Swiss-Prot record:
Residues 43-67 are annotated as: Disordered. PANTHER family: CHOLECYSTOKININ. GO terms for cellular component: axon; extracellular space. Induction: By lipopolysaccharide (LPS); in hypothalamus. Residues 1-19 form the signal peptide. The precursor is cleaved by proteases to produce a number of active cholecystokinins. Keywords: Amidation, Cleavage on pair of basic residues, Hormone, Secreted, Signal, Sulfation. This is Cholecystokinin. It comes from Carassius auratus (Goldfish). The gene is cck. GO terms for molecular function: hormone activity; neuropeptide hormone activity. The modification Phenylalanine amide is found at F111. Belongs to the gastrin/cholecystokinin family.
Amino acid sequence: MNAGICVCVLLAALSTSSCLSLPAVSEDGGQSDLGIVMEHTRHTRAAPSSGQLSLLSKAEDDEEPRSSLTELLARIISTKGTYRRSPSPKSKSMGNNHRIKDRDYLGWMDFGRRSAEEYEYSS
């Protein structure tokens, strides 16, 4: 039991250290790659002061939903015009002799009674 826990802790420590370590630097282009990695690291860790951050986030929050909703609405309206509410030409091609015309079967109410009348049971 203790050995299993030790193995799990060891694997967790190794995976954490390998995820956090920087990639190996080659000698030919190592300086440029290292500079890019260090610049990226500095950029992600740098944060504006809390006052600037709150003003920036409020401005983005107010503007972003409105613009995204406007774009979404415009896209929905533009695609809505392409759909037709009238019957499709495919349904018109069935003709007047089709069995299920206008999705109405002439004798739909008396299905059970018809079948019972056809097969009269002698009792």
